[in-house]
């Protein structure tokens, strides 16, 4: 479970195995005052990764300003048969965007309308989470 300074979690289902995933790793950047609580340490290994900005997003959590440069982007699902859930939060953990990105044909509902791409405006300290086994590419606009 990942908690912010208010004890609110925003990645618990991705990390606790509640939802099945074909991924065996995630990238995670802990910001100031965030805690990672690991309950089953025998099943987890932690390795530091170099911090550099990217526009290629796999499953994980990304901090704008540390992992991704602020700006306007088109977020595209680049994997042919995969689906990703892209969520964007502001620095107070308020949801700004929640999109299902896929190139597959899927049924839409009133609340879920999958699409291959979406435009996003991201600011320093915004948080992007990607859940799924595909790759999401951010193209600067």
Where are these regions (language model features)?
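Primarily secretory-pathway and cell-envelope proteins
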Residues: 2-53, 80-141
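A short beta-strand element within beta-rich, extracytoplasmic domains
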Residues: 68-80
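Short, solvent-exposed S/T- and G/P-enriched segments that are highly enriched in secreted/extracellular
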Residues: 22-24, 57-71, 114-117
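A short tyrosine-centered beta-strand micro-motif
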Residues: 1, 62, 73-75
């Amino acid at each position: 479970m990942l908690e912010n300074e208010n004890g609110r979690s925003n990645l618990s289902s991705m990390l606790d195995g509640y939802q099945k995933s074909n991924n065996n790793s995630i990238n995670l950047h802990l910001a100031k005052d965030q805690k990672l609580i690991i309950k089953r340490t025998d099943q987890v290994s932690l390795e530091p990764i170099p911090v550099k900005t990217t526009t290629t997003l796999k499953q994980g959590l990304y901090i704008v300003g540390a992992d991704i440069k602020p700006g306007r982007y088109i977020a595209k699902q680049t994997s042919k048969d995969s689906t990703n859930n892209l969520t964007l939060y502001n620095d107070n953990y308020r949801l700004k965007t929640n999109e299902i990105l896929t190139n597959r044909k899927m049924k839409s509902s009133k609340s879920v309308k999958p699409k291959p791409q979406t435009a996003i405006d991201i600011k320093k300290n915004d948080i992007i989470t990607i859940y799924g086994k595909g790759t999401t590419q951010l193209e600067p606009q």
